[in-house]
Structure formats: C-alpha cells, structure tokens
C-alpha cells in the first residue's frame, strides 16, 4: 500500500513537472515567433524607408513620393495603473523607391482579421509592391498609388500583395526634417528646418487632435529626412483568446487590458536620398 502511494506521488510530481516544462517551452516558442516576426518586419521597413526617393513628377495628379494616413486608434490600459493609457495607432503608408531604370511603389496597410469585430485595430499587415519602367513612370506617375488604393479596398489591381504579420495592433509613423525636428501642422513658417516649398509638402491633423497625430503627403522634390515608425504585435495567446470572444464589447474590453502582451518595435530611419533644397 505504501509503495502504491509513493508511486502515485512520484507519477503526479513528474506529470506536473512535465506539464510546466511543456507550458514554458510553448511560451518560449510563441515569444520567439513574435520577436522574430517583429524583427523581420522592422528590418524590412528600415531597409526600404532609407531608399525613399523624390519622384520630381510635374503632373499634378498622383505625384506622390510619400504619404501616411491614420486609419484608427485604440487606447489600452497600462498594467498596475488605472489612469494611464497607451494609444495604439494604425496607419497606412506609401512611398517611392528608384533603382536604375525602374521605379517601385511600396505600400503597407492593415486588413482587419475576418474573425475580429470591425473598428478594432487588430489585423494582418499587408505589403503592396508595383514596379514600372522610367518611361511609364514619367507618363503615369499616379499608376502605382492608384493600384495601391485599389488593393486596399479589395478591387482588382496591378502589382503584388504579400501577407507580412498577424495580430498587429499598432502601425504608426512620424517624419522629421533635416534638422531633426518633428514635422507637424502646428509648426507654421518660418521655424528652423521647416520645409519652404509648401506646394511639395503637407501635414495635417486627423479628426483626433489629442494626442497629436499627423497625416503626411510629400510630392515633387520633397521627402522626409527621417522617418520614425512603431510596430506593435499582440502575443499569439492573447490574439487567440481575443478571436474566441464572440461579443464585440467583450472583445474590446479584453483588448483594453492587454497592453502588457503587446510587443512594440520602434525605429528611426535616415532617408539617404533627401533633397535638401526642399527644406
């Protein structure tokens, strides 16, 4: 009898140990996947953003070099603090790159997951790309951004769209001038470093004025001197639990409490081909 009891205790102890080991192993694998995905996307964005070039297009229609537009924002409660909040912002971005006789338009945008309620910034980060010849770009500078806009709304388009990351809750950008100052609408002329050719640049606040968010549009000879971006990814376990909740309000309340399970990647990139005559 004593032997049976001892064997039962040993078996239960080993089972508990193996269960904890398995849980820790799975958590480590999930964390590794999240970090690797975030690092991959950050490296890809950084490498592309530093290659942004001005298109110098003279046609008024569609001569976009760089633009970002805020899509939505969602506050999340900070851990151990019932007052402070973190606001996740989701934006879309488009920019031009140039290599030899080829112009390429690249855009990133978030597609809400089909299992997630609309209006909440949790979704899949997609990457759009379309390359054209220099001759085609000279005649149709709006071709790439036109197809990017069609791809975003699910219409037929030229180019390719690739799925990059799942569970993205924050995707936001800021631009800076050659002196390192943040470009925003409250900086009217003539503060130091402000772009002087305003026909080639615009920045405006979206509907929400606080905290300050800025939509950017650079055309002609202007591109930002620096681009700072933030990418926030919800951990897989939290994302799976979030998707399993059938009620929109419950989903929202759950997401609001998960700021500690968002992995944030932030980087500031220097644009190599900035035309300083635009500043």
PLM features per residue range, with description:
Residues 26-31, 147-156, 247-254:
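Short helix/strand-bridging catalytic loops that position acidic/His residues to coordinate divalent metals
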Residues 56-59, 99, 157-279:
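Short linear sequence signals and composition-biased patches located at protein termini or domain-edge surfaces
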Residues 27, 33, 41, 49-84, ...:
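Short, glycine/small-hydrophobic-rich surface segments
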Residues 69-180, 184, 188-199:
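Surface-exposed loop/linker segments characteristic of extracytoplasmic
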Residues 1-52:
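Aliphatic-rich helix starts adjacent to a transmembrane/signal segment
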Residues 2, 33, 37, 156, ...:
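Conserved aromatic-histidine-acidic binding/catalytic patches
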């Amino acid at each position: 009898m004593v032997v049976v009891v001892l064997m039962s205790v040993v078996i239960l102890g080993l089972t508990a140990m193996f269960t904890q080991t398995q849980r820790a192993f799975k958590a480590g694998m999930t964390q590794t996947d999240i970090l690797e995905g975030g690092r991959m996307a950050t490296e890809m964005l950084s490498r592309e953003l530093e290659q942004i070039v001005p298109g110098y297009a003279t046609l008024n229609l569609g001569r976009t070099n760089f633009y970002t537009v805020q899509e939505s924002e969602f506050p999340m409660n900070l851990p151990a603090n019932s007052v402070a909040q973190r606001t996740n912002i989701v934006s879309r971005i488009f920019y031009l790159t140039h290599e030899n006789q080829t112009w390429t338009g690249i855009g990133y945008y978030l597609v809400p997951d089909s299992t997630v309620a609309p209006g909440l910034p949790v979704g899949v980060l997609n990457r759009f790309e379309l390359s054209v010849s220099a001759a085609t770009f000279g005649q149709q500078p709006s071709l790439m951004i036109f197809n990017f806009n069609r791809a975003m709304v699910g219409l037929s388009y030229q180019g390719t769209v690739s799925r990059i990351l799942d569970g993205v809750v924050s995707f936001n950008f800021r631009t800076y001038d050659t002196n390192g100052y943040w470009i925003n609408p409250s900086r009217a002329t003539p503060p130091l470093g402000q772009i002087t050719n305003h026909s080639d640049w615009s920045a405006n606040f979206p509907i929400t004025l606080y905290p300050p968010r800025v939509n950017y549009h650079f055309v002609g000879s202007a591109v930002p001197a620096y681009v700072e971006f933030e990418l926030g990814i919800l951990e897989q376990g939290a994302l799976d639990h979030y998707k399993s909740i059938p009620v929109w309000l419950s989903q929202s309340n759950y997401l609001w409490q998960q700021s500690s399970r968002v992995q944030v990647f932030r980087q500031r990139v220097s644009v190599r081909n900035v035309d300083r005559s635009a500043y």
